[in-house]
Amino acid sequence: MASYGMNDVKNGMKILVNAEPAVITDTEYVKPGKGQAFTRVKYRLIKSGRVQEVTMKSTDTLEAADVVDTDMQYLYSDGEYWHFMQQETFEQVQADKNGMGGAEKWLKGEEQCVVTLWNGVPIGVQPPNFVELKITETDPGLRGDTSGGGGKPATLETGAVVRVPLFVNQDEVIKVDTRSGEYVSRVK
């Protein structure tokens, strides 16, 4: 297995920490006035999302993780698994609830996603940045409601709940930012 020296470590690299894949989020090289230089490495565990920090000597190494980000198309969910297909090879993989990481609330079918595979198994799914979903349930809009007057909760066709402006009604299609879970606009 490949390994990285402390001089080669950069943000975004995938490493193994205690046999679990992680992404480096921040590195800081520290050269104190007295003593040996060291590197502070901050990383996020891909499966759990926890952020941790470790201090390493300049002679230490980090093991590279066999983690691949692949563009795939979301096909369907059978209740227990979410199925994805690679467009070029038509190879299919299935992700469980842990592998989805909360992305399932933004997917209705045929969206292009980035699936993170570790040893061929999905451990993370990143949905498109923006999705268009239909509102299935919300309070009715009243006369005089404007965009500046707060908001109301709306349930989308996938089961996700987002805050929308008061003028948005049931059965309308809205655009949602999946990174923040916020309403962006109505779709005409």
Swiss-Prot record:
Q: What cellular component GO annotations does this protein have? A: cytoplasm
Q: Which GO terms describe its biological process?
A: peptide biosynthetic process
One Pfam family per UniProt: EFP_N
Intracellular or extracellular location(s): Cytoplasm
What is the similarity comment for this entry? Belongs to the elongation factor P family.
Q: What function does this protein fulfil? A: Involved in peptide bond synthesis. Alleviates ribosome stalling that occurs when 3 or more consecutive Pro residues or the sequence PPG is present in a protein, possibly by augmenting the peptidyl transferase activity of the ribosome. Modification of Lys-34 is required for alleviation.
Question: What is the official name of this protein in its record?
Answer: Elongation factor P
Lineage of producing organism: Bacteria, Pseudomonadati, Pseudomonadota, Gammaproteobacteria, Lysobacterales
